[in-house]
Amino acid sequence: MTDDKDVLRDVWFGRIPTCFTLCQDEITEREAEPYYLLLPRVSYLTLVTDKVKKHFQKVMRQEDISEIWFEYEGTPLKWHYPIGLLFDLLASSSALPWNITVHFKSFPEKDLLHCPSKDAIEAHFMSCMKEADALKHKSQVINEMQKKDHKQLWMGLQNDRFDQFWAINRKLMEYPAEENGFRYIPFRIYQTTTERPFIQKLFRPVAADGQLHTLGDLLKEVCPSAVDPEDGEKKNQVMIHGIEPMLETPLQWLSEHLSYPDNFLHISIIPQPTD
């Protein structure tokens, strides 16, 4: 991969100032103060909120505590989506800090998966990495790794260790020089305006004539409404990690540098702010 390490670091160390507030319906023995935290964009809510959980449990009776879950303006937050994706999709036009409501009861079974332990997060994360490598290298790279390499990827994410993670992850970002890129680009496109969870299709980074496909090429093929407004007026923002990459950016470069730790490009299509 081309080595733009500063870009990789900027992506890894992206943070979202967040204010956690206990839901007013929760029964407490005394008033619960809000809890402030800088959330890592590349991580998962249930992986980085142990302190939040402990903070609010201090003011509650044990019998009133069941599984923790989070909500933003009425929308339950999926723990298996990266934090940065959740923010871009649901709150990117709102003022900071991001105001998240904490719940310990009335778990929304229809909207959220249960997260019984960190093992569930690890299993989800490794499943995504394996799926991404199946697309990129027919699973050859991830299958040739030892179990300790898989563990190092997970521990690097869990403990926020950039160098530990990238020492292994860089192998997943390599490809034979003669091929100019991966077999297919692992991506998922999310929209708030549709019930469909996300769009995911096979898409090659290089065209048949050898030209590098761009972000714009991908969107025109799999989500044309995002880039081709009927009246010519820009209706949407295309966001990855809180920024709007130029549509001319080669998809291969984006995949190497702006993928989340699970090796997917998580792309948010959100309505253009009206103000």
Curated annotation (Swiss-Prot):
Subunit structure as annotated in this protein's UniProt entry: Forms a conjugate with ATG12. Part of the minor complex composed of 4 sets of ATG12-ATG5 and ATG16L1 (400 kDa); this complex interacts with ATG3 leading to disruption of ATG7 interaction and promotion of ATG8-like proteins lipidation. Forms an 800-kDa complex composed of ATG12-ATG5 and ATG16L2. The ATG12-ATG5 conjugate interacts with RAB33A; this interaction is bridged by ATG16L1 and promotes ATG12-ATG5-ATG16L1 complex recruitment to phagophores. Interacts with TECPR1; the interaction is direct and does not take place when ATG16L1 is associated with the ATG5-ATG12 conjugate.
Lineage: superkingdom: Eukaryota
Gene Ontology molecular functions: Atg8-family ligase activity
Lipid bilayer topology: Peripheral membrane protein
Phylogenetic lineage: Eukaryota, Metazoa, Chordata, Craniata, Vertebrata
Methyltransferase in keyword set: no
Family: Belongs to the ATG5 family.
Job description of the protein: Involved in autophagic vesicle formation. Conjugation with ATG12, through a ubiquitin-like conjugating system involving ATG7 as an E1-like activating enzyme and ATG10 as an E2-like conjugating enzyme, is essential for its function. The ATG12-ATG5 conjugate acts as an E3-like enzyme which is required for lipidation of ATG8 family proteins and their association to the vesicle membranes. Involved in mitochondrial quality control after oxidative damage, and in subsequent cellular longevity. May play an important role in the apoptotic process, possibly within the modified cytoskeleton. Its expression is a relatively late event in the apoptotic process, occurring downstream of caspase activity. Plays a crucial role in IFN-gamma-induced autophagic cell death by interacting with FADD.
PTM sites of type N-acetylmethionine: M1
GO cellular component, one term: autophagosome
GO biological process, one term: positive regulation of viral translation
Cross-link annotation Glycyl lysine isopeptide (Lys-Gly) (interchain with G-Cter in ATG12), location: K130
Name of the protein: Autophagy protein 5
Compartments where found: Cytoplasm; Preautophagosomal structure membrane
Keyword tags: Acetylation, Apoptosis, Autophagy, Cytoplasm, Immunity, Isopeptide bond, Membrane, Ubl conjugation
Record PTM text: Conjugated to ATG12; which is essential for autophagy, but is not required for association with isolation membrane.
